[in-house]
């Protein structure tokens, strides 16, 4: 790569992206109910106040940007709970906001990982997974990727796989890769 991103990779501490992504989600914050990280807060609110319009994560923390090797691309999720008439379970929907996306390198990963995250959170909160709306401010294809993308577009599509989770897992933090059923 000959881009600003490749310079970042050269500078970064081996194996670390700095204070981005997981680091930000794991920072404990004081709430009136006690200390929680962002994931714990989402789980708490979904279980205790599911119709709140304040259930979200945000990992674009300006005071820590200088310690991130890359600014977060996918930076916030907002959760919304609905109830379908005639059904007992609530439905968990989410909006994923992303400032930038390299369509070839990231799109499939982002869609899969955040869809799976939505499914895991829904199951842990005894809800059904609903819609994931993915908002990308700058979705781009680099010139050097055009031949590969043309090749991919020309291929015969296969049916999308069906993805399920082990229904026995009720604790978000107990999921393992073995609980993903494709």
Model-assigned labels for residue ranges:
Residues 2, 27-29, 81:
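A generic structural signal for solvent-exposed, polar alpha-helical segments
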């Amino acid at each position: 790569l000959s881009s600003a991103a490749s310079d970042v990779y050269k500078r970064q501490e081996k194996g670390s992206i700095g204070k981005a992504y997981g680091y930000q989600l794991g920072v404990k914050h004081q709430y009136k109910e006690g200390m929680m990280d962002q994931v714990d807060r989402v789980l708490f609110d979904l279980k205790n106040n599911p119709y709140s319009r304040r259930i979200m994560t945000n990992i674009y923390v300006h005071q820590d940007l200088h310690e991130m090797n890359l600014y977060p691309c996918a930076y916030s999720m907002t959760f919304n709970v609905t109830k379908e008439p005639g059904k007992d379970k609530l439905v968990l929907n989410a909006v994923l906001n992303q400032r930038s996306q390299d369509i070839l390198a990231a799109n499939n990963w982002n869609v899969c990982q955040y869809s799976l995250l939505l499914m895991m959170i829904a199951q842990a909160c005894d809800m059904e997974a609903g819609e994931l709306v993915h908002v990308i401010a700058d979705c781009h294809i680099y010139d050097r990727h055009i031949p590969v993308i043309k090749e991919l577009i020309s291929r015969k599509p296969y049916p999308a796989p069906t993805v399920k989770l082990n229904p026995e897992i009720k604790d978000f933090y107990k999921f393992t890769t073995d609980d993903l059923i494709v």
